[in-house]
């Protein structure tokens, strides 16, 4: 079922007109041993996906059947793509859920090896709103683990499905989910020698694609603000490339400063009050930070080298960046206010496009060497380097809001164009992200507010 076009920015207050904990449900929180088998143990090694059953949500009226099926399918797809869950085919179900207020027949679900069960209901209200309810059950113990109800406009059913997915993920793993989020990326179309690039926005699963620019000018390196309401990006228009600020809610944009020379790789600070970027002056590229309120600019590096691709740590105390000051591109870390930079990458090849995890535990990067482009992670001190995926041309990693999944783009070369992929920080579960056309340079938003 397709979801109707949604406004570019809808916050939870606008969308969820009210929400309440369902009767008898436990308060949401970290998973506990008392949950029995319905628990996903997340480690850096292999994880056995948790078998989970997700029947179509019960419809309050026949006209809501399609919505109920659509919500269940989105939840199923989200959990399956995470690699931590193994949704059971509905054809194997023994019991048909018709009333979520009555406990399920748990023997019917243990017989198909389900360890967790999700039940739900979609009901149209007299005022036109849609009431969405769900329950999460531990099949082995018969314990209800979570339950919530939401009231929203019918066109936002897909977002409700993402929010419910996050609730299930958090309850069964003990970690925050990442499904109620968006990705901004560069949509590419046309032949390789006349490629048209547009700024585009979509849900993290590839749905609800919106085009934010027309494609008349080249756009690159879009990045979200912490509020998810603004995007900063680079555009090659008339003259030197400039850094722009785009408001998703209003569709308005403005130039971030009017700097001489070229500006590159803009990114927001964690509080959203500053933008850090690389400015080219006199053949060198150095890092600068601009205060968005005062428009004042502070220089952070001053070297006869190319310093670019800066990214803040989550606490805004440090930045990582790419520099060729040592001869070839490597990753450096320094205080966010400037000062002594410490090199942290020492493997063979060159390193680029570093980005700090929202959890603060890893820095992701692109590594080039031996004719291959790899996506990897390392700890902020440079230890524990791990290659997650490699190929002819992989580039541009970006972290999911919970820091457990990376998205990047892969370009096979030739006349074919790039595509988006996701991979777990353990290097498992590499999956292609569906997009209408070619796609590159993704940036993952925080969880929507």
From Swiss-Prot:
PROSITE patterns in UniProt: TAT (PS51318)
One record GO biological process? cell division
- Give the matching Gene3D superfamilies: TolB, C-terminal domain, TolB, N-terminal domain
Q: Name one Pfam family in it.
A: PD40
Cellular component GO terms, alphabetical = periplasmic space
| Compartments where found | Periplasm
Does the record bear Iron-sulfur in its keywords? no
List UniProt keywords, sorted A-Z.
Cell cycle, Cell division, Periplasm, Signal
Query: What's the family?
Result: Belongs to the TolB family.
Functional note: Part of the Tol-Pal system, which plays a role in outer membrane invagination during cell division and is important for maintaining outer membrane integrity.
HAMAP family reported in the protein's UniProt record: TolB
Q: How does it assemble?
A: The Tol-Pal system is composed of five core proteins: the inner membrane proteins TolA, TolQ and TolR, the periplasmic protein TolB and the outer membrane protein Pal. They form a network linking the inner and outer membranes and the peptidoglycan layer.
Tell me the PANTHER family matching this sequence.
PROTEIN TOLB, PROTEIN TOLB HOMOLOG
Please give the name of this protein: Tol-Pal system protein TolB
Organism of provenance = Rhodopseudomonas palustris (strain HaA2)
């Amino acid at each position: 079922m397709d979801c109707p076009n949604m406004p570019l920015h809808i916050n939870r207050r606008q969308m969820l007109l009210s929400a309440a904990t369902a009767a008898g449900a436990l308060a949401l929180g970290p998973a506990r041993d008392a949950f029995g088998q319905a628990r996903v143990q997340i480690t850096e090694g292999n994880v056995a996906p948790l078998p989970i059953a997700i029947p179509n949500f019960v419809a309050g009226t026949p006209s809501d059947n399609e919505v109920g099926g659509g919500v269940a399918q989105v939840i199923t797809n989200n959990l399956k793509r995470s690699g931590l869950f193994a949704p059971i085919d509905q054809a194997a179900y023994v019991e048909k859920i018709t009333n979520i207020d009555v406990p399920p027949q748990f023997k019917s679900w243990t017989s198909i090896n389900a360890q967790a069960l999700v039940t739900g209901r979609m009901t149209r209200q007299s005022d036109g709103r849609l009431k969405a309810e769900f329950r999460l059950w531990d099949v082995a113990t018969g314990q209800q683990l979570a339950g919530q109800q939401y009231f929203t406009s019918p066109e936002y059913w897909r977002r409700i499905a993402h929010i419910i997915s996050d609730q299930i993920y958090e309850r069964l793993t003990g970690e925050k989910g990442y499904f109620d989020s968006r990705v901004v990326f560069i949509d590419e179309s046309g032949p390789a020698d006349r490629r048209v690039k547009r700024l585009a926005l979509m849900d993290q699963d590839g749905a609800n694609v919106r085009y934010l620019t027309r494609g008349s000018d080249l756009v690159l390196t879009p990045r979200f603000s912490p509020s998810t309401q603004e995007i900063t990006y680079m555009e090659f228009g008339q003259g030197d490339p400039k850094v722009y600020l785009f408001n998703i809610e209003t569709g308005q944009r403005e130039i971030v400063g009017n700097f001489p020379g070229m500006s590159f790789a803009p990114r927001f600070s964690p509080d959203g009050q500053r933008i850090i970027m690389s400015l080219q002056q006199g053949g060198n590229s150095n890092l600068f930070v601009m205060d968005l309120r005062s428009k004042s600019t502070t220089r952070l590096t001053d070297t006869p080298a190319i310093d670019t691709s800066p990214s803040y740590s989550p606490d805004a105390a440090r930045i990582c960046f790419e520099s060729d000051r040592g001869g070839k591109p490597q990753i450096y870390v320094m205080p966010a206010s400037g000062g002594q930079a410490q090199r942290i990458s020492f493997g063979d090849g060159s390193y680029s496009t570093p980005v700090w995890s929202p959890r603060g535990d890893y820095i992701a990067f692109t590594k080039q060497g031996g004719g291959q482009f790899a996506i990897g992670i390392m700890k902020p001190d440079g230890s524990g380097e791990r290659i997650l995926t490699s190929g002819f041309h992989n580039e541009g990693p970006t972290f999911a809001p919970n820091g457990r999944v990376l998205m990047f783009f892969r370009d096979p070369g030739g006349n074919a164009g790039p595509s988006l992929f996701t991979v777990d920080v353990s290097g498992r579960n590499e999956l292609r992200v569906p997009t209408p056309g070619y796609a590159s340079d993704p940036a993952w938003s925080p969880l929507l507010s």
